């Protein structure tokens, strides 16, 4: 099954991205989602090639946010697709059955939709306010996660659900009690002054 901790990369330049990704990898994170927006496609390709090599060095899973064709071109482990990105069926045709395709959801109905579309895991959020995303869906909180997980149980839906959006270390125990499978974090790791201690604690809690 998939690692329960996913780091979504941050950084406005290739150098910043690589620094942050290496920080996550060398301190124990085994799953990287590369997210590099608002830049030239050549920069995204250059970064993706470098991150792939880095993830191979640490035997970590490497997926790319949004860019199915790039994931195919460099043979990444998969992609993560938002609700307004390429549809999952089309991505599956391009990437094949063996690749990981994650999908975003904000409601139980969207979880069912993503499951029917045959994605491998769902990023469900946001948990709370986050500055990482400009257009934020309605915040779910612990109550929202608990409700959606209970609804999934009644439907016998076992797709892995990752909590995402503004998660802090002190939230993790309560989030996991809702029945969530794992967490995806960005700023929490990027901004950490002691990433080894943080990631070790996160991996223990998960």
UniProtKB/Swiss-Prot annotation:
Biological process per Gene Ontology, one example term: thiamine biosynthetic process
CC per GO annotation: cytoplasm
Binding site for Mg(2+): 66, 85
UniProt-listed Enzyme Commission number(s): 2.5.1.3
Keyword ATP-binding: no
Catalytic function, reaction form: 2-[(2R,5Z)-2-carboxy-4-methylthiazol-5(2H)-ylidene]ethyl phosphate + 4-amino-2-methyl-5-(diphosphooxymethyl)pyrimidine + 2 H(+) = thiamine phosphate + CO2 + diphosphate; 2-(2-carboxy-4-methylthiazol-5-yl)ethyl phosphate + 4-amino-2-methyl-5-(diphosphooxymethyl)pyrimidine + 2 H(+) = thiamine phosphate + CO2 + diphosphate; 4-methyl-5-(2-phosphooxyethyl)-thiazole + 4-amino-2-methyl-5-(diphosphooxymethyl)pyrimidine + H(+) = thiamine phosphate + diphosphate
Pathway: Cofactor biosynthesis; thiamine diphosphate biosynthesis; thiamine phosphate from 4-amino-2-methyl-5-diphosphomethylpyrimidine and 4-methyl-5-(2-phosphoethyl)-thiazole: step 1/1
Primary enzyme class: transferase
Domain of life: Bacteria
Disulfide bridge map: none
GO molecular function: magnesium ion binding; thiamine-phosphate diphosphorylase activity
Record-listed 2-[(2R,5Z)-2-carboxy-4-methylthiazol-5(2H)-ylidene]ethyl phosphate binding positions: 130-132, 166
Cofactor(s) named in the record: Mg(2+)
UniProt KW keywords: Magnesium, Metal-binding, Thiamine biosynthesis, Transferase
Residues the record lists as binding 4-amino-2-methyl-5-(diphosphooxymethyl)pyrimidine: 33-37, 65, 104, 133
Keyword hit for Transmembrane: no
The record's free-text note on cofactor binding: Binds 1 Mg(2+) ion per subunit.
Family indicated by similarity: Belongs to the thiamine-phosphate synthase family.
General function of this protein: Condenses 4-methyl-5-(beta-hydroxyethyl)thiazole monophosphate (THZ-P) and 2-methyl-4-amino-5-hydroxymethyl pyrimidine pyrophosphate (HMP-PP) to form thiamine monophosphate (TMP).
PANTHER family xref list: THIAMINE-PHOSPHATE PYROPHOSPHORYLASE, THIAMINE-PHOSPHATE SYNTHASE
Protein name as annotated: Thiamine-phosphate synthase
Phylogenetic lineage: Bacteria, Pseudomonadati, Bacteroidota, Flavobacteriia, Flavobacteriales
